[in-house]
């Protein structure tokens, strides 16, 4: 019983830490980590996101190091950034939180890098309101991987979001149904130095800050239309 209570307390503390205020330096580190994740995944020769999905993407979210706790209640949480395609390139990024839970025993904690790709205009639409739940408010599917994945068509009919994970060097599509995605308004305000409307930022009405230029350039490079990777 004591071990159970101790584990539960640790889980709550870890989850609370994910919601703690971040410094601008922390946010800069998060953006740089997101770019590193994107670079490492997209520079793989074959085991990567198919070209037709890259070309069709409307928004891209990267969550470096999402945690699945090694506790009785398998809480999952992570923080990341999102940018969306606009009429003149890709938007400045906003900060998001992801949280979910899988009931049951967990053995060992895991840290997993996630990439979310919206493949139509509805993919991240609910995020503009405040938050949404994957699989409920936005239909989602584990994304196809590799050049052969271009032949897969099921996702075109059934999904607004495609989700990918990398764990211990292995990259694959992953189901994230039940995971909540919400605006991190505090971190976004800290990064920009003033409150920002997610709708305004993601529609390209806010300039890309110097600290986010390299991340946005990386997204623009990898998710470029009509370009061989």
Across the structure, where does each feature detected by a protein language model lie?
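Generic cytosolic/nucleocytoplasmic N-terminal low-complexity/intrinsically disordered segments
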Residues: 1-2, 38
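Basic side chains
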Residues: 2-3, 30
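Eukaryotic low-complexity, non-globular regulatory regions
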Residues: 3-5, 228-229
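Sec-dependent N-terminal signal peptides
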Residues: 4-14
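Sec/Tat signal peptide C-region and signal peptidase I cleavage site
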Residues: 15-21
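Small-residue-enriched, tightly packed secondary-structure blocks
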Residues: 21-229
